[in-house]
């Protein structure tokens, strides 16, 4: 495990999830793990690439990833959540203090039945324990999503959910994806990705957001906190910027946090899930702002590399007068004025084959804190009005080593 001081100086990872595998050869064989890169990890389990786990080898292959739980926040975001431990708790629920009597309801059990919770070997047992984890006092406050890729597993989940008295918090979304029957309920369709391979696991979704905040805070003169009206000093204070494209609202972290918490119905909550921006009054996700803040304050070299790469991309598409043939295809020095000491592109997971790796800047491989997923509404808004160049960020994070097959 990484040194605590080192881990807490790294940006929040772009993606981290827990997953459930099922053997397509022996469907009673299940495996639970955690990873920052689901498609890469699935390929490892199936022997396509090196890695994987001993209990997912040979006669039980190929495996399918039937569901993932995504949206984990880092400890630096104050949610006190360790993704490795969460996986362990899901695998060994009988030994987890989070699956005791502190579920989110007083009678969160299957109607008409009471029995001690033992090791979950069946698919139904794993789903029961996952449901209980999401209802528990500790985990119900996290901005999580449960994404199903197999329709039969999703249907079993729905049947179990209908039979139990306990309810998962409204902010925890259940997304039928992959082969699941398309669910037309509002707010779900735009979340579908289609397959494990299409899950976005890098920082590219927040590149334009990072660019916006960097340039907005570069000249802090006359900037004021929208909540307390006091001046903001980005170099000395933790400052948040609204992720909405056309909103330039700036707030102190503590001021905005207090405002969001004051507006929630859950008076016992310590960390916000979301809230309305005091500037544009649109709902924004706390986890998205925390990811941007951590990258801006802890990943200075990586941030400058993103900006430099984006600047180069803008230079390539810069209009050149047709009659001035001597300048066609050239890029002026003034157009790309970033310091030469700044690194270049940042690779994404599995993209090490890129030819232009001589100036890449990479994050260290000794950190694995988890991240809450970004708001897709906000990301879609950014993508339409600020098309980003295909820069990539590599996150080298250890996968879970815990084996649990039935």
Curated annotation (Swiss-Prot):
Compositional bias annotation for Basic and acidic residues: 98-113
Domain GIY-YIG: 14-97
Pfam families, per the entry: GIY-YIG, SLX1_C
Gene Ontology terms describing biological process: double-strand break repair via homologous recombination
Main location: nucleus
UniProt keyword list: DNA damage, DNA recombination, DNA repair, Endonuclease, Hydrolase, Metal-binding, Nuclease, Nucleus, Zinc, Zinc-finger
InterPro entries: GIY-YIG_endonuc, GIY-YIG_endonuc_sf, Slx1, SLX1_C, SLX1_endonuclease, Znf_RING/FYVE/PHD
Zinc finger (SLX1-type): 225-280
EC numbers, comma separated: 3.1.-.-
One Gene Ontology cellular component annotation held by this UniProt entry: Slx1-Slx4 complex
Cofactor(s), names only, from the UniProt record: a divalent metal cation
Superkingdom: Eukaryota
Known function: Catalytic subunit of the slx1-slx4 structure-specific endonuclease that resolves DNA secondary structures generated during DNA repair and recombination. Has endonuclease activity towards branched DNA substrates, introducing single-strand cuts in duplex DNA close to junctions with ss-DNA.
Subunit structure: Forms a heterodimer with slx4.
Official protein name in the record: Structure-specific endonuclease subunit slx1
Protein source organism: Aspergillus oryzae (strain ATCC 42149 / RIB 40) (Yellow koji mold)
């Amino acid at each position: 495990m990484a040194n605590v001081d080192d881990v807490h100086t790294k940006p929040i990872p772009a993606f981290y999830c827990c997953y459930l595998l099922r053997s397509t050869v022996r469907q009673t064989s299940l495996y639970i793990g955690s990873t920052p890169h689901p498609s890469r990890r699935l390929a490892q389990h199936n022997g396509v690439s090196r890695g994987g786990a001993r209990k997912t080898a040979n006669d039980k292959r190929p495996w399918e990833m039937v569901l993932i739980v995504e949206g984990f926040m880092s400890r630096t975001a104050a949610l006190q959540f360790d993704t490795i431990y969460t996986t362990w708790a899901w695998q060994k629920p009988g030994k987890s203090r989070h699956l005791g009597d502190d579920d989110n309801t007083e009678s969160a059990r299957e109607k008409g039945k009471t029995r001690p919770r033992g090791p979950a070997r069946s698919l139904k047992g794993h789903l029961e324990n996952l449901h209980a984890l999401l209802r528990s006092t500790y985990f119900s406050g996290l901005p999580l999503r449960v994404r199903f890729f197999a329709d039969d597993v999703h249907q079993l989940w729905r049947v179990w959910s209908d039979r139990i008295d306990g309810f998962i918090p409204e902010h925890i979304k259940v997304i039928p994806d992959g082969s699941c029957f398309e669910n037309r309920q509002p707010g779900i369709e735009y979340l579908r990705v289609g397959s494990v391979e299409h899950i976005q696991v890098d920082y590219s979704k927040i590149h334009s957001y990072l660019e916006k905040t960097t340039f907005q805070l570069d000249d802090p003169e006359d900037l004021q906190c929208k909540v307390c009206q006091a001046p903001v000093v980005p170099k000395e204070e933790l400052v948040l910027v609204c992720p909405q494209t056309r909103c330039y609202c700036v707030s102190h972290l503590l001021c905005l946090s207090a405002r969001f918490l004051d507006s929630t119905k859950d008076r016992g909550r310590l960390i916000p899930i979301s809230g309305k921006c005091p500037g544009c009054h649109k709902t924004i996700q706390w986890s998205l702002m925390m990811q941007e803040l951590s990258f801006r304050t802890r990943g200075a070299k990586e941030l400058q590399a993103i900006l430099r790469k984006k600047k180069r991309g803008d230079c390539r598409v810069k209009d050149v007068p047709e009659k001035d043939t001597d300048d066609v295809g050239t890029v002026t020095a003034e157009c790309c004025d970033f310091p030469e000491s700044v690194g270049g592109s940042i690779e994404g997971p599995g993209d090490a084959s890129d030819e232009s790796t001589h100036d890449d800047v990479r994050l260290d491989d000794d950190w694995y804190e988890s991240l809450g997923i970004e708001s897709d509404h906000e990301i879609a808004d950014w993508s339409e009005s600020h098309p980003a160049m295909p820069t990539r960020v590599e996150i080298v994070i250890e996968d879970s080593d815990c084996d649990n097959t039935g």
